[in-house]
Amino acid sequence: MQILKDIEAIVGTKGILTGDDVSNRKAGIWIDEGIKAKAIVRPKNTEELSKVLKICNENKQPVVPHGGLTGLAEGAITQAGQIAISTERLNEIEGIDTVGRTITLGAGVPLEKAQNVAKENNLMLAVDL
């Protein structure tokens, strides 16, 4: 499929999963079946993410965001023709401003890691699940 080739040109071979690499991944921590999607795209920065979403939009390709796949809201259930956009590689601590008391995190930073970074810098992450 051309759209998948175009996306791979942006994210590289490590940034896109297809076939068994998709279906062998669990759809969530509470779901035993595999993910049903055309592909899982794993951008490593917002520039790649933006380019991928532009291609998907131009091709009217449905996408579903994938975060931690806890399934608490069941908002990340994909269907066979859709593309999952995973945040797993968007996992960098981008900046810590102790004066402004802010931390800039990638969308894929696990909550526990974010809380630990905040604590190490005498800050508090105001999210509690």
What spans do the regions from the language model cover?
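Short acidic, glycine/serine/threonine-rich loops at helix termini
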Residues: 74-79, 115-117
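Short clusters of hydrophobic/aromatic residues that line enzyme substrate/ligand-binding pockets
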Residues: 16, 25, 72, 93-96
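N-terminal accessory segments
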Residues: 1-29, 58-61, 68
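Short glycine/serine-rich loop/turn segments
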Residues: 30-33, 77-79
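Active-site cofactor/substrate anionic-group-binding motifs, chiefly glycine-
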Residues: 55, 60-65, 70-77
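Short basic, glycine-rich beta-strand/loop surfaces that mediate nucleic-acid
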Residues: 80-87
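N-terminal glycine-rich flavin-associated loop
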Residues: 7, 31-63, 87-129
